[in-house]
């Protein structure tokens, strides 16, 4: 039906997103005749390139694969197509099979559908269960636990190659995806009443929730965890840490769901050695009036489990 036509897609370069689109695109072309032309750019450049292209009306790209947090910036000026009627008419899409959060939040704005989720982005903590079991250690339930475990394993040979390895591997590269990770670390110190209570701003008065002991605690974690990571940790991103973790060089990491299939892929050194869990939390949260950390109680932290 679409023989001779080409669709231009922009996303981040490298294997993590661009390559899977190319791989699946081959089957798409077989089914439709529509060819796919991929443009891969550094993660730090995707937003600006899309915004510039759309705003100038150049229209070099038909499709963008990007984090949903940017969606509103493209919708309000009218750059994205309202997909609502097309989605509802396409029975093969099976829209209701998409998890409600990603269907209603990540893909929709103001009651209309503007994007199709490629995956469901949420962070998890991953750990070498073989190492922790051998040492009689439990997986981390708090970020303090995470640091304690990372310190314990740092500098030890974790994959049997005779070289010292690392307690923790986190992608901290500037203009990379490290800001997602530090937000996940800060969240339990800032937000204890559910997502409606806000994280970056207090919804009651719109004052920033940054200059407080909670975010300071997250930055302290960032600094200390660097002591237990690869020597170049401040210059690596998640694409690098995934390879480090699956080669057996890291006791802990924080990532999206990608670690799961990568850990059991051909060549992985950690097959059947990886555990995962909901992100560690905190036994303290900020008092929003004072900005100080206070201990969790049932009223302060109603969603806590065992005080975390």
Predicted regions and their residues:
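Hinge/lid segment of periplasmic solute-binding proteins
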Residues: 1, 68-124, 138, 181, ...
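Extracytoplasmic "Venus flytrap"
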Residues: 2-23, 43-44, 121
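Short, well-ordered beta-strand elements
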Residues: 3-14, 34-39, 62-63, 114, ...
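Extracytoplasmic "Venus flytrap"/periplasmic binding protein-like
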Residues: 23-98, 130-141, 242-244, 251-252, ...
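Hydrophobic residues within well-ordered alpha-helices
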Residues: 50, 146, 153, 183, ...
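Extracytoplasmic/periplasmic solute-binding protein
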Residues: 105-118, 123, 147-207
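Glycine-centered hinge/linker elements that transmit conformational signals in sensory
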Residues: 150-152, 197-235, 275-286, 294-305
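Glycine-rich, aromatic-lined ligand/substrate-binding cores of catalytic
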Residues: 215-218, 223-226, 240-266
């Amino acid at each position: 039906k679409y023989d001779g036509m080409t669709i231009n897609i922009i996303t981040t370069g490298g294997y993590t997103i661009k390559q899977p689109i190319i791989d699946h695109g081959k089957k798409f072309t077989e089914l439709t005749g529509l060819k796919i032309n991929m443009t891969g750019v550094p993660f730090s450049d995707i937003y600006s390139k899309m915004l510039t292209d759309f705003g100038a009306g150049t229209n070099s790209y038909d499709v963008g694969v990007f984090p949903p947090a940017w969606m509103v910036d493209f919708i309000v000026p009218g750059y994205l197509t309202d997909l609502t009627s097309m989605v509802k008419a396409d029975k093969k899409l099976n829209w209701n099979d998409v998890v409600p959060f990603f269907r209603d939040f990540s893909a929709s704005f103001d009651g209309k559908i503007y994007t199709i989720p490629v995956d469901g982005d949420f962070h998890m903590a991953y750990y070498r269960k073989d190492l922790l079991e051998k040492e009689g250690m439990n997986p981390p339930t708090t970020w303090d636990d995470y640091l304690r475990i990372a310190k314990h394993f740092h500098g030890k040979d974790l994959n049997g190659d005779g070289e010292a390895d690392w307690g923790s591997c986190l992608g901290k590269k500037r203009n990379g995806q490290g800001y997602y990770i530090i937000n996940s670390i800060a969240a339990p110190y800032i937000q204890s009443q559910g997502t409606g209570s806000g994280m970056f701003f207090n919804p009651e008065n719109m004052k920033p929730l940054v200059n407080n002991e909670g975010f300071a605690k997250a930055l302290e974690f960032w600094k200390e965890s660097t002591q237990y990571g690869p020597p170049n940790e401040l210059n690596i991103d998640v694409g690098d840490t995934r390879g480090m973790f699956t080669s057996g060089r890291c006791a802990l990491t924080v990532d999206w769901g990608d670690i799961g299939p990568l850990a059991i892929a051909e060549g992985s050194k950690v097959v059947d050695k990886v555990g995962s869990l909901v992100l560690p939390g905190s036994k303290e949260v900020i008092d929003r009036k004072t900005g100080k950390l206070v201990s969790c109680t049932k009223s302060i932290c109603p969603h806590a489990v065992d005080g975390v």
